[in-house]
Curated annotation (Swiss-Prot):
Keywords: Cell cycle, Cell division, Cyclin
One GO term (biological process): positive regulation of DNA-templated transcription, elongation
Gene Ontology MF terms in the entry: cyclin-dependent protein serine/threonine kinase activator activity
Similarity section: Belongs to the cyclin family. Cyclin T subfamily.
CC per GO annotation: cyclin/CDK positive transcription elongation factor complex; nucleus
One Pfam family recorded for the sequence: Cyclin_N
Gene: CYCT1-1
InterPro entries, per database record: Cyclin-like_dom, Cyclin-like_sf, Cyclin/Ssn8, Cyclin_N
Name of the protein in question: Cyclin-T1-1
Gene3D superfamilies per record: Cyclin-like (1.10.472.10)
Length: 446
C-alpha cells in the first residue's frame, strides 16, 4: 500500500480482509464487517437528522473507511470516529453544521433506546466533555488521512455516462444510484475508483431491468474509461454483496418518511369523495307541515302586522258589519245599506254614517279590514233612516237624563224604556241602537 499519494487509498481485497490494523489487534473479519455496517448506518441516521445531502453522508462514510484502513477498531471507538467524520465531512462538502448540534444529534442517536441517557447531553459538563473529545478526534482523523480532501464519488461519472449514452429510463437510473449507495457502505470504495463502481452499477441496473445498453459503434464501458478485466472484477464483487437482494429495495439516497401510525392515519385529512351524478342533482324536499302551535303563532303574527299597518280608525270587524247590515229596518231599501266607519277611542271624534254605498264597496272594506282593535266597554252602532246622527249627542242626552234622576249623592235607577222615550222626544226621529257587548245582537227601535 503506497503512502502519500491519492493511489494509496485503494487496496486489494486480500489486504482488506487479512492485513488491516484491526486484524493485528485480534478483531476478526466478521466482527470488523459488523462494526463497519454499524458505523455506516449510524452516519446515515445522523446525516438524515441533520438534513445533510447524500454527498455529505457519502463523504463521511468514506472518511471513516479510510480511517480504519490505518487505525484499529480495538483502539478507537466507532461512535466517536463516526461523529468526527460527520463534522469534518460537513465542512469539506461546504454544508457546515455547528459542532454542538452535531454532538447533540449524534448522542441522541446513539442512545435512542434510552431516553434518560439521551437527555444527559443537555447537561453542561457532559456537553463540554463531548466537545473536547470530538475536537481531539478531529485532529487524529486529519493526521490519519494526511489532510487529503480529494474525495470523489461514483455519482458524477454515472451522471455523465447516462447523458452521453442517452439513457433516460428512470428505472435504470434509480437502480444504479441505489447500487452506488450500498457500495459506499462496503470496502468497494477503497478497492475501486469511483468510475469503476459507476460502470458496474449501470451494468447491473440494466441487467435487472432487461435494458440493453446502447453502443453507437463502440463498447458502452468506454464511456467510463475502464478495462474489461477490472470491470468484471467489480461486477463480480457487487454481485456477491447484493446476491439474493432486490436492487429496488436497496436504500435510496434519502430514506422515505416513516409509515404513519394508526393515530396519525386517523388525523390525516382526506378530501371529500367526488359526488355521483345523482348526488350532484339538487334534491327538492317538501317543507314540513306546520304544527298547530306554529299555525297559531303565524296567525297571531299576521294579525299583529295588520293591526300595526292599518289605522285603528278602520278597525271594525267584518262580522260586525255583516250583522249590522242584516239588522236594518224593513222600511229601509237594500240599496241604501250603509257602511259604518269604526269609532275612535277618543270621545271628541264623531262617527259618521256613510249612506248609499254599493255592495262592491262593502266587499272591499270587508276584505281590507279583517278585525278591529276596539277597546271601548260598550259600543253602539247607530243607523238612521233620514240623516246622520251624532253618537256624542245621544250620549250627552243620556247623561242629562241621568242627571235629572239623581237623588242626593246616589243616582236613582234609570228606566231604559223611559230613557228611550226621553231621547225620542229630544231628537224627534226614529233611531235603531245595537248593543255589541252582549252575547246576542239586540235591535231596539227608539
Amino acid at each position: 500500500m503506497g503512502e502519500g499519494a491519492a493511489g494509496s487509498w485503494y487496496v486489494t481485497r486480500d489486504e482488506v480482509e487479512r492485513g488491516s490494523p484491526s486484524r493485528r489487534d485480534g478483531v476478526g473479519a466478521a466482527k470488523e464487517a459488523e462494526l463497519r455496517a454499524t458505523y455506516c448506518s449510524f452516519i446515515r441516521d445522523v446525516g438524515l437528522r441533520l438534513q445533510l445531502p447524500q454527498v455529505t453522508i457519502a463523504t463521511a462514510t468514506l472518511l471513516c473507511h479510510r480511517f480504519y484502513l490505518r487505525q484499529s477498531h480495538a483502539k478507537n471507538e466507532w461512535q466517536t470516529v463516526a461523529t468526527v467524520c460527520v463534522f469534518l465531512a460537513s465542512k469539506i462538502e461546504d454544508t457546515p453544521c455547528p459542532l454542538q448540534r452535531v454532538i447533540i444529534v449524534a448522542y441522541e442517536t446513539m442512545y435512542r433506546k434510552d431516553c434518560n441517557a439521551a437527555h444527559r447531553i443537555y447537561q453542561k459538563e457532559v456537553l463540554e466533555k463531548q466537545k473536547e473529545l470530538i475536537l481531539v478526534g478531529e485532529t487524529l482523523l486529519l493526521s490519519t488521512i494526511r489532510f487529503d480532501f480529494n474525495i470523489q464519488h461514483p455519482y458524477e461519472p454515472l451522471k455523465l455516462a447516462l447523458k452521453k449514452l442517452g439513457i433516460f429510463q428512470m428505472e435504470v437510473k434509480q437502480v444504479a444510484v441505489n447500487l452506488i449507495n450500498d457500495a459506499i457502505r462496503t470496502t468497494l470504495v477503497v478497492q475501486f475508483k469511483p468510475h469503476y463502481i459507476a460502470a458496474g452499477s449501470l451494468y447491473l441496473a440494466a441487467k435487472f431491468n432487461n435494458f440493453r445498453l446502447p453502443s453507437d459503434g463502440k463498447v458502452w464501458w468506454h464511456e467510463f474509461d475502464v478495462a474489461p478485466k477490472q470491470l468484471q472484477a467489480v461486477i463480480q464483487q457487487m454481485t456477491e454483496l447484493f446476491m439474493g437482494r432486490n436492487p429496488c429495495s436497496m436504500g435510496p439516497a434519502i430514506r422515505p418518511p416513516p409509515t404513519p401510525s394508526l393515530m396519525e392515519r386517523q388525523q390525516v385529512i382526506r378530501p371529500p369523495p367526488t359526488p355521483t351524478l345523482m348526488e350532484r342533482q339538487p334534491i327538492i324536499r317538501p317543507l314540513p307541515t306546520p304544527t298547530l302551535m306554529e299555525n297559531q303563532h303565524i296567525t297571531h303574527s299576521l294579525g299583529a302586522v295588520m293591526r300595526h299597518t292599518h289605522s285603528s280608525i278602520r278597525s271594525l270587524s267584518n262580522n260586525f258589519d255583516r250583522e249590522a247590515s242584516r239588522s236594518l229596518p224593513l222600511n229601509i231599501p237594500a240599496n241604501r245599506k250603509s257602511t259604518v266607519c269604526p269609532a275612535r277611542n277618543e270621545g271628541n271624534q264623531s262617527l259618521r254614517m256613510h249612506m248609499g254605498h254599493s255592495n262592491g264597496s262593502d266587499a272591499r272594506f270587508e276584505k281590507q279590514y279583517s278585525r278591529g282593535a276596539l277597546k271601548a266597554d260598550h259600543v253602539y252602532h247607530v243607523v238612521s233612516g233620514q240623516k246622520d246622527l251624532h253618537v256624542t249627542g245621544i250620549r250627552d242626552l243620556v247623561r242629562q237624563k241621568r242627571t235629572f234622576h239623581e237623588v242626593g249623592e246616589h243616582p236613582a235607577p234609570i228606566d231604559k224604556s223611559d230613557t228611550k222615550s226621553w231621547i225620542r222626544k229630544r231628537h224627534g226621529r226614529n233611531v235603531i241602537v245595537f248593543d255589541t257587548k252582549s252575547s246576542s245582537w239586540k235591535k231596539q227601535k227608539l
